[in-house]
């Protein structure tokens, strides 16, 4: 466990206790998978202090944790998250924009990663989740992504349909071990899959796991940094040779 992780865990407990002792809602910054994993390790130390994790939309990977609840405090405070719609001025002449393109352009403005949530892209339009106190600056400062001129505005509603799209995928494996599933879905060898676990790049429901033989539970989200994420839907049948047909929802 690194010193930075220990400091982060102490910070979580400080924020939780501040909420409890002062009777107010307290928010973290946006948390990535590694930070969420650190939070999962101190949940038992919260002594029943309520919390909620939310990233601006159902299915968001990067989330803010809010300590406190309406039931306990008697009032409600929404998450301080703004949604920025970023679209090319002209789709006809726009580059094909990726998550990396959007993130790089925003970070080049001098913005801290901790103030940014997910960036979802639909039909070459980016939906950027950001802290309220930085959103207006992004809107006024981000004029170009890659070589494409952009038009930005803060929106109150997300596009209809699923912002985070998944596709059903079936893989065949000898068992439900998580390392085998990761290897099959991302087209790599078991050895390469095992390396990802050793590097602490695999997370189950936001908690890091190095256990290559872990059997996922139905509904758990498996995230692999640098590769993608999926929802485990279980084994629904067997092949004639006895292999399992495993179904997953893979984020696309």
Over which residues does each language-model region extend?
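Ferredoxin-like alpha/beta domains used as RNA- or RNAP-binding modules
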Residues: 1-179, 185, 208, 221, ...
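Basic (Lys/Arg-enriched) interaction patch that binds polyanionic ligands
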Residues: 175-226
